[in-house]
Amino acid sequence: MRRRALMLMSIAAPVLGIANHGHAQDGSKPFTPEQLDQMLAPIALYPDSLLSQVLMAAGYPLEIVEAARWSKANPTLKGDAAVAAVKSMSWDTSVKSLVAFPDVLTNLDSHLDWTQKLGDAMISQQQAVADSIQRLRAKAAAQNNLKTTPQQKVTTEGSGDNVQYVIEPANPQVIYVPAYNPSWVYGPWPYPAYPPVYYPLAGAMMSGFFWGLGFAAGAAMFSSWNWGRGNAYVNVNVNQAQNIDN
């Protein structure tokens, strides 16, 4: 993320105000709630920090490609060690952070049409994206598929019709990436014309929910959703982000 963007996001500015990369929808119709749920289904249950950085990075698809190539050329580097190794790269901070998670980066690189849509949606419809994330999390919770585990801590904010689901790593220094089949984890899918996207991570089961190894990547996490101030707001730890670049 560019330095100016970091400073603005640190005071909870909407993503639209600081991350317009010039390709958002280009005058076409906005994505519908059904389309957003479809494209966000594979990642809505990621920890908040990782999810926000994936969506930021999706706005830089060419850099995603370059970072994925670097990751494939350096297969022994993962977690914070990988992030430290790309400090000198000119990529956005969010893209650099994803080299900590090779499978996540590979998924974004292998399905660039999906990645482009994620980036477009985050740039031009950030509130709708946040609403979709919470809608999907509520579905998973209703199926008893979103709960606190040794890998993650799940809490809620708000009450009544305004409950927000917060997902954090159980250990802030060790990040686990869930792999799951959206058709299973969310229960009956309400939009037959828009089945959920499913790009399983390496090693994931064809159905159900799977935890792989945790990554020592606490230093790579610099953002989170500020659900309490409106779903579309993302908080950035400026010092943490600058440590990735410098």
Indicate residue ranges for each PLM-predicted region.
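N-terminal export leaders
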Residues: R3-M7
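Bacterial N-terminal signal peptides
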Residues: M9-G17
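N-terminal non-cleavable signal-anchor helices
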Residues: L16-A19, T155
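Boundary at the C-terminal end of the N-terminal hydrophobic targeting segment
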Residues: A19-D26
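Folded, non-transmembrane soluble domains that reside on the lumenal/extracytoplasmic side of membranes
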Residues: K29-Y176
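Low-complexity, repeat-rich tail regions
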Residues: Q125-N246
